[in-house]
Amino acid sequence: MILESARLDVLPGQEDAFLAAFEQARPLIAVQPGFVSLRLLRCLDPGSESRFLLQVEWERLEDHTEGFRKSAEYQGWRELLHHFYSPFPLVEHFGSDSLG
């Protein structure tokens, strides 16, 4: 199991529009081979209300990097969401063999 973690800094004042677009984009990722689950969390710290954390579980790293990112659905995902970000998200992948 792989956990993709993305810190999303949304343009201030665009949070509601981003959340609406995210709901439209969610089915695009959910149909991907190897997709397991996702959750979107909003930062609670004062002054950081425009920051979100996206966590996506994949069966394998390649399901995200080779599968989803090279799919037609990813193009739709980009069109719906990427214009909300500044700066562009930091995306990292974590494996089950991590310490803990």
Map each language-model feature to its residues.
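Short, well-ordered beta-strand segments in beta-rich or mixed alpha/beta enzyme
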Residues: 2-9, 39-69
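Short, surface-exposed ligand-recognition loops at beta-strand->loop->(often short) alpha-helix junctions
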Residues: 10-18
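General helical structural elements
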Residues: 11, 30, 43-46, 82
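Short amphipathic alpha-helical coupling segments at ligand-binding clamshell hinges
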Residues: 17-21, 67
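Short amphipathic alpha-helical/adjacent loop interface patches that line ligand
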Residues: 22, 26
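An amphipathic, aromatic/His-enriched active-site/gating alpha helix that lines ligand/cofactor pockets
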Residues: 27-36, 57-92
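Short, low-order "capping/linker" segments at domain edges
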Residues: 95-100
